[in-house]
Amino acid sequence: MSKIVLAYSGGLDTSVAVAWLKEKFGAEVITVTVDVGQKEDFKEIEERAYKAGASKHYLIDAKEEFVNKYIKPAIIANALYEEVYPLGTALARPLIGEKVIEVARKEGADAVAHGATSKGNDQVRFEAAFKALAPEIKIIAPIRMWGMNRKEEYEFAKKKGIPISAESKKYSIDENLWSRSIEGGELEDPWQEPPEEAFEWTVPPEKAPEEPAYLTITFEKGVPVALNGKRMELIEIIDTLNKLAGQHGYGRVDHMENRVVGLKSREVYEAPAALTIINSKKDLEKLVLNKREYRIKRMLDSYWADLVYDGLWFDPIRVALDNMLSELSENVNGDVKVKLYKGSLRVVGRRSPNAIYDKAISSYESEWFPSDEMARGFIDAWLMDSVVSFRKRYLK
């Protein structure tokens, strides 16, 4: 084995992995860092990669691709795993895997590697991308192989002269444009309230402004295109909402999560923009979709989120679901007015040129009402199956 391409975050695990891979396989190690919006010092990451022993380092700016190829379909699918988590990490991993494979092909590498552990979801997500896109390339998972604990990793890094000052952080953080995940420390106790020091994107709700913020989000075909009437690129909308909603304390998630590998974990997230966009659009869908469309879309949305969380981005059913959900979103056009106030978001208005709601028919103040004869006929036909089966079974 002569060349290994490693998905490199710059943290302890992947930095140790560089030196370990060189030592274990006698191979040249090429590191790849993919910029998906994480607030990192990429120059420092590059320097650390070389100090760890990398022969070459790639920094790939994939923010626009992340937004257009991954976040956009997630918005259309109202993607919230277990109804709360907007899949920031799960969406980024297939893209990172794809970029690692591109570099591996360019460099003529024999193998690719990742820094995921055997307890986490990311091992599945990375390897799904590797296997789908380059089944001929060998996959190496150093952390699953070396058997070192955290303390031993530090000692190994010190021995190899790898600078890991950032690893004194209390929590394990994964961040991109769509969400920020926080793990470790006292958060592993489900009874322990997350301390404020764990959060960066959102202010404590009780310290948010005393005055609410009203915001109008315009959607076209299920995708936000404007804020307060000003058209913006999706990446700009996400950035703006992360700041605005976060300033009002909105966007925190704290829940018990069912991992791909069968373990439960306590997960804490910040996702102000994601939750603002998705919860606004879900309300708009109620205005423009009929009852059957709405019910089917809710089912498909949930399945899409489960699929992506479980590492199956490269499954053909995901492509089919994208097509179905896009078709169902053709009429999801209009404006949603939301009120942000001290950690909460309320939809307070919605309008659409495609609205199915008709005040002239629905209002109790309108002159049109179904006749008694029409109502009786509908009720009898609607209830027949239920009434007959209930009486036959339980009123003998």
Curated annotation (Swiss-Prot):
Pfam families for this protein: Arginosuc_syn_C (PF20979), Arginosuc_synth (PF00764)
CDD domains for the chain: ASS (cd01999)
Pathway of action: Amino-acid biosynthesis; L-arginine biosynthesis; L-arginine from L-ornithine and carbamoyl phosphate: step 2/3
InterPro entries: Arginosuc_syn_C, Arginosuc_syn_N, Arginosuc_synth, Arginosuc_synth_CS, Arginosuc_synth_type_1_subfam, AS_cat/multimer_dom_body, Rossmann-like_a/b/a_fold
Any one annotated GO CC term: cytoplasm
Family the entry assigns: Belongs to the argininosuccinate synthase family. Type 1 subfamily.
The name this protein goes by in its record: Argininosuccinate synthase
